[in-house]
Amino acid sequence: MEVGVGIHIIADFYGVDSELIATTERMYPIIEGAVEYGRLTKISSDYYQFRPKGASGIVLLAESHLSFHTWPEYGLVTLDIYTCGDPKTADDAFAYLVDKLRPTSISTRKIVRGDMIEEAGENQIEEAALH
């Protein structure tokens, strides 16, 4: 059985409006909105504006982090959402980003982090019983 300590969503959004993702000024409210919508706890954030266009940012969360990079020339946004605790928070933040960025296609990987915790615990119990 998978227990894990968190959910890690790694996604590439294709076909996103290049003007929407060209600047930190446009991305900031979208990313911060995802944090709020996902009921995540923001500790700090940092955003970087590339020249002539493109943006990157990271939000440090009590639950872990949310980061992004944009390539307006390709209509591409790459996202990383890692949250510990209730997996619904990551899913909700992700759904918010899909709604606001409106990609034409998405490539997503969802990883359970720390999924061997229970297995490791069982092995330790078995080893202790042998001694």
Curated annotation (Swiss-Prot):
Species of the source: Thermoplasma acidophilum (strain ATCC 25905 / DSM 1728 / JCM 9062 / NBRC 15155 / AMRC-C165)
Oligomeric form and interacting partners: Heterotetramer of two alpha and two beta chains arranged as a dimer of alpha/beta heterodimers.
Family matches, as InterPro entries: AdoMetDC_fam_prok, S-AdoMet_deCO2ase_core, S-AdoMet_deCOase_pro-enz
Coiled-coil segments: none
The entry's keywords: Autocatalytic cleavage, Decarboxylase, Lyase, Polyamine biosynthesis, Pyruvate, S-adenosyl-L-methionine, Schiff base, Spermidine biosynthesis, Zymogen
S-adenosyl-L-methionine keyword on record: yes
Gene: speH
Name listed for the protein in its UniProt record: S-adenosylmethionine decarboxylase proenzyme
Lineage: Archaea, Methanobacteriati, Thermoplasmatota, Thermoplasmata, Thermoplasmatales
Signal peptide: none
